[in-house]
A protein has these predicted regions:
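Extended, charged catalytic domains and RNA/DNA-binding interfaces, predominantly
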Residues: 115-252
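Divalent metal-dependent hydrolysis catalytic cores, especially in the metallo-beta-lactamase
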Residues: 25-38, 45-72, 88-103, 127-146, ...
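Metal-dependent catalytic neighborhoods of phosphoester/phosphodiester hydrolases
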Residues: 69-79, 105-108
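N-terminal hydrophobic targeting/anchoring segments and the immediately downstream early-domain regions
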Residues: 18-22, 49-56, 78-81
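Glycine-rich beta-alpha junction loops
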Residues: 98-100, 213-219, 277-281, 303-309
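His/Asp/Glu-enriched, well-ordered alpha-helical/loop segment
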Residues: 221, 226-275, 289-378
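His/Asp/Glu-rich metal-coordinating catalytic cores
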Residues: 89, 106-113
Length: 379
């Protein structure tokens, strides 16, 4: 947690802050000692106080064990009631990472599961109490998905639950892809986005967002250089990509079908894409070029942040070469850099302050239809 007296907003001129917006942590897993996914220990008052101290709003992002659905419903009910009473003004929504994931990546495996129709209805009902998005894999039902063995002919499909979620204010957040068939996965990206827009969404905001671009998806490039050995090759590798020559019409060829589909739809204003700017989830120059192509107005910086060495009932650890959190098997589980540090990184890579403000505040307020300190909008 940031213990400095200077808040994230204080890093910017008053003119940029004049609209009354605050920066938004749009995807984060833990502030201070609390793991948001530990529903027994989740301290909403502590999170609110941390947000005030850092000068941010937050959308805490939880992993959900199937046996905790009752507790999750109770938590969002309490959250909504307190918001209605004017409390928790800096906690501007709740999010889930999963449970419908084709590749669990750094997500605890026990929090990846295939909801029944009734469970989707229960999750959708949480929309009225502040659930603003759930990360899901567009290729979750395809060959190569980690859920493949659990899918039976009667399992609800996207056509059954995406309209239900979206009409309840719960956005699909696209991520955690299989690597088996990138072209097919990209086609499913388009399908989910079409379904969301055809599901009666009338705004405010947008009906689809993403998990972090370039992570947990099939790629045609090396997107990150996390070890000392990898960084020794970094400059030569990134130079070979000729970033300045990247164009959206060549994104499939350069980056691969899945990131290209996401970036194309973001640039068209149909979705908003999240990207991490800690320089470790994604190389900062690659992230910068992707943002330039999509537009800052269509992009949100996310931290994927966890402040403690525990997340979703699993122990985490740091490696010597970076600030990321790792699972025991060496898979990246989360980031640890707060938004203030990512602001500094964005400045060092040539973004103007008005562009950075758009990335950490403006786009999120538009996409989630926030007002004042933040009130999530509903369709």
């Amino acid at each position: 947690m940031n213990t400095a007296t200077q808040t994230v907003s204080d890093l910017f001129d008053a003119e940029l802050r004049a609209a009354g917006q605050l920066p938004v942590e749009v995807h984060c897993h833990g502030f201070g000692p609390v793991d948001f996914s530990d529903l027994d220990a989740l301290d909403l008052d502590g999170l609110e106080a941390a947000c005030v101290a850092e000068g941010v709003c937050a959308i805490p992002t939880l992993y959900l064990h199937r046996d905790c659905l009752d507790a999750f419903e109770a938590m969002v009910g309490t959250y909504a009631a307190r918001r209605a009473d004017g409390e928790l003004r800096h906690i501007v929504g709740i999010a889930l990472e999963g449970p419908l994931l084709a590749s669990h990546g750094g997500t605890p495996a026990a929090t990846v599961w295939l909801p029944t129709r009734g469970e989707w209805e229960r999750l959708a009902a949480c929309g009225r109490n502040g659930l603003v998005y759930t990360v899901m894999s567009p290729d979750a039902f395809a060959a190569g998905s980690g859920l493949e063995g659990e899918i039976d002919p009667g399992a609800p499909r996207f056509e059954d639950f995406v309209p239900l979620l979206v009409s309840s204010g719960v956005r699909p957040a696209l991520g955690h892809f299989s690597r088996k068939d990138p072209s097919r996965s990209a086609a499913f990206v388009e399908r989910i986005i079409d379904l969301a827009w055809q599901s009666g969404w009338t705004g405010p905001g947008l009906p689809v967002v993403t998990d972090h671009l370039f992570n947990d998806m099939p790629l045609a490039i090396r997107h990150a250089f996390r070890t000392r050995r990898a960084r020794a090759e970094r400059d030569e590798t990134v130079a070979s990509y000729r970033l300045e020559e990247w164009t959206m019409d060549r994104a499939d060829e350069i980056l691969g079908p899945v990131p290209a589909a996401i970036m194309r739809n973001a640039a068209a204003g149909r979705i908003a894409a999240c990207i991490n700017f800690d320089g470790e989830h994604v190389d900062s120059d690659i992230a910068k070029r992707a943002i330039e192509l999509m537009g800052t107005e269509n992009t949100m910086i996310m931290t994927d942040r966890c402040d403690s060495a525990r997340l979703g009932r699993q122990r985490l650890h740091h490696e010597a070469d970076n600030t990321l959190w790792y699972q025991q098997d060496g898979v990246v589980a989360a980031g640890s850099q707060p938004l203030s540090r990512q602001v500094t990184n964005a400045r060092e890579h040539g973004f103007r302050d008005d562009e950075i403000w758009q990335l950490i505040a403006g786009t999120a307020h538009r996409v989630f239809a926030l007002s004042g300190a933040g009130t999530p909008g509903r369709p």
